[in-house]
Amino acid sequence: MKGYRSRYTLEAADRIRKLHPQVKQEIRQAIKELLVSPLNGHSLQFELAGLRSYRIRTYRIIYRINDDESCLDIVFVGPRRNVYEELRTLLLAQREDS
């Protein structure tokens, strides 16, 4: 499998920036691993179909594989307990703005 590059949404970049330095380092390391093996994350279903989730400690990295551009789109990062609800809310707000 070819190597991928990462691309971050503004929301994901902002959330990573606000994390504790140790957690931020672990998230960045996990993303580097995903660039080599992007299928390591779990496929999401229903309204989140097309996205994948990767667990690192108590956090989730939500991303999309873009094979055409050899890119991983990092969509969202957050604590496991509410990451999917927050992501659904964000996606719904984006659809309403369109």
Residue spans of the language-model regions?
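Arg/Lys-rich, positively charged N-terminal/basic patches that mediate binding to nucleic acids
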Residues: 1-25
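Enrichment for repetitive, rod-forming helical segments
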Residues: 22-24, 31, 59-62, 87-88
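Short proline/glycine- and basic residue-enriched helix-capping loop/turn segments at helix->loop/beta transitions
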Residues: 33-37
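Short, functional N-terminal and low-complexity linear motifs
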Residues: 9-11, 29-31, 52-56
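Basic/aromatic recognition patch in beta-strand/loop cores that engages polyanionic ligands
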Residues: 39-82
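Enriched for short, Lys/Arg-rich terminal
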Residues: 2-5, 64-98
